[in-house]
Amino acid sequence: MIAVIPVRDGVAPAGADETICEASGQALLIGSRTAQALENLGQVAHQVWLVESTIDAAHVIAAVNHIGRSRESLILPASPDGRDLAPHLAHALGRNLYAGAISISDNKVSVSRHGGLSIADFSPDASFIATLQIGIRGVDSMSASPTITSVDIAPTSNTAQTSVISLAVMPPDASTMDLSEAPRIIGGGAGLESGERFVQLQNVATALDASMGVTRVITDRGWAEHERQIGTT
């Protein structure tokens, strides 16, 4: 298996390190300033390929073919880029897609179902595409430095014409992003005694470019959405 890690401006997504560990340290970093992103991932990687290109299925497939690993299963972190890229890869390669997996190996994929209330086990008989849930497995450190290879993908002349042009990629809004992907969380609980206090807390979180998290008692009172809940429940 190979972990495919989308990189934007030198930043790898949440869950990149776990996904690389799930792939036994083998990773293909694709995007912009991948070498910079590797600085924070080198301790979990064994073999790394760096691809400076746009992040799309065609370039990932070209890179995998270039390194001679076209028959490998590809796994991605279940980050926004990973969730977007995985189905495109599955469609282009004609492979099964296992989304939201909690454990991945060559012969068994366990996928969370029904909001985490059940687990479905699959036994793939061919190469597949999968996304690994963020924060589910932890990381394993490698003692040796990784082997790093830069992969140059030459542009092809038969690229399909399109009327859609990407002008820019805007960063996520910390106040609305999923808590599992938030780099910084400002939390509050029953000690804040009214809904107005949580409006203030949200304003503080926004000012600090952070996400607001609350305890279950607060969501039960209706002072914040259940998507903002933190803690073991």
Region locations from a protein language model:
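N-terminal glycine-rich FAD/FM-binding segment characteristic of electron-transfer flavoproteins
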Residues: 1-233
